[in-house]
Design a protein with these regions (language model features):
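Short beta-turn/strand-loop junction motif enriched in small, turn-promoting residues
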Residues: 27-28, 58, 93-94
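Acetyl-CoA-dependent GNAT
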Residues: 54-58, 122
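Vicinal oxygen chelate
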Residues: 12-16, 71-116, 121-127, 138-152
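Short, solvent-exposed beta-strand edge segments and adjacent coil->beta transition regions
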Residues: 3-7, 65-69
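Short glycine/serine/proline-enriched coil/turn segments at secondary-structure junctions
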Residues: 60-63
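Polybasic, low-complexity binding patches
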Residues: 131-137
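Core segments of cupin and vicinal oxygen chelate
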Residues: 10-51, 55
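Short beta-strand micro-motifs in enzyme catalytic cores
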Residues: 38-40, 68, 105-107
Length: 152
């Protein structure tokens, strides 16, 4: 049985242009350009690749074509989430939602191609989080988080 998401491939109008978002905002390493298929591969440094961008058809609309979002867990809790929030704003990204799910706290935002992404940090240990979910207690409460100061 599958146990985790190994990688995600997103369609991008121009993978070369969108690549800057993934390196500059998410801090990913650009590991390979597969020119034959107009793809760019990225890694967080522990795997050969975690995410790839592939050229979308010329007439493809922006946004979620067949999926909701991709979530990226962050280490460092709220302080790191605030830093990433600042980075998103500095990049000009659209932050859509700030949510407290009970077992995690999240910021949802769009990449340059309108794909919805999420940064989150867990607020409880995995076993407790599983019990929390199974009990139907996870939610979508507002999360009052401010971005880190511009100098952070």
């Amino acid at each position: 049985m599958p146990t985790k998401v190994a990688h995600v491939v997103l369609a991008a109008r121009d993978p070369q242009v969108s690549a800057a978002f993934y390196t500059e905002v998410l801090g990913m390493q650009r590991v390979w350009d597969f020119d034959q298929l107009d793809m760019v591969f990225f890694s967080f440094g522990e795997r050969d690749h975690d995410l790839a961008l592939i050229k979308a058809p010329e007439d493809a609309p922006l946004g979620n074509q067949g999926f909701s979002h991709v979530a990226f867990e962050v280490e460092g809790g709220e302080e790191e989430l605030r830093r990433l929030y600042r980075r998103l704003l500095d990049y000009g990204s659209d932050v859509e939602l700030k949510a407290d799910h009970g077992l995690s706290k999240s910021i949802y935002f769009l990449d340059p191609d309108g794909n919805r992404l999420e940064f989150f940090y867990p607020t409880m240990e995995p076993d407790a989080a599983m019990d929390f979910m199974r009990a139907g207690r996870a939610g979508l409460d507002p999360y009052d988080i401010e971005p880190a100061s511009a100098s952070a």
